[in-house]
């Protein structure tokens, strides 16, 4: 990806804003997706992508092209590209759910639930099924780092089939760890002492 490809090119962000193309930002994201994995190359993912930048290309389109590029590199000799592709898909998911500053931290699960309930995507009553102290305990069990353990095939299934989303627009509203924990919280909502007996931790322990 040569710097000359940025000349005058504008990209459209997920929030509708338009800004100059930043190839360095793309490269850093691919590097992060490859971090700690043997037998993979960020440069190879970028070259394989063959992205043709044009004015108005969306960041979502760029992300999906990079995901496909990494997934196309998966073979018997380079199996770790399945994790590169998964991470690139995950980064796009995080941006969609939390915005561009997702890497600064994830919202408390109770905050995420209440916001989702206001938007009509979660049951309004679930937040009241547990005390604030119980929600704090539930939040402490969530380890978003587990998302990094997904293979591409596994995460693709979760994203396409199970996460809460608008099927008409494709907009996603939650991440895998929130999904697992909120499903568990719903199942055990009427069980006495469900939190103290740690029933709710089971789905996240077995999340991959």
Label every PLM stretch briefly.
Residues 199-208:
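Single conserved hydrophobic/aromatic residue that forms the stacking wall/gate
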């Amino acid at each position: 990806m040569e710097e000359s490809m940025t000349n005058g090119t504008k990209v459209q962000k997920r929030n509708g804003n338009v800004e100059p193309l930043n190839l360095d930002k793309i490269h850093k994201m691919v590097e992060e997706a490859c971090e700690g994995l043997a037998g993979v190359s960020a440069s190879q993912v970028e070259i394989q992508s063959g992205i043709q930048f044009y004015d108005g290309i969306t960041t979502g389109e760029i992300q999906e092209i990079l995901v496909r590029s990494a997934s196309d590199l998966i073979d018997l000799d380079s199996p770790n590209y399945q994790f590169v592709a998964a991470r690139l898909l995950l980064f796009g998911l995080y941006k969609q759910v939390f915005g561009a500053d997702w890497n600064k931290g994830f919202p408390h699960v109770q905050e995420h639930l209440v916001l989702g309930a206001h938007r009509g995507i979660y049951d309004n009553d679930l937040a009241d099924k547990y005390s604030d102290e119980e929600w704090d305990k539930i939040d402490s069990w969530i380890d978003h780092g587990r998302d990094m353990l997904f293979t591409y095939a596994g995460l693709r299934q979760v994203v396409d089939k199970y996460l809460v989303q608008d099927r008409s627009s494709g907009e996603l509203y939650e991440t895998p760890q929130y999904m697992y924990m909120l499903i568990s919280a719903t199942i055990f909502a009427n069980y006495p002492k469900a939190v103290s007996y740690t029933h709710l931790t089971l789905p996240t322990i077995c999340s991959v």
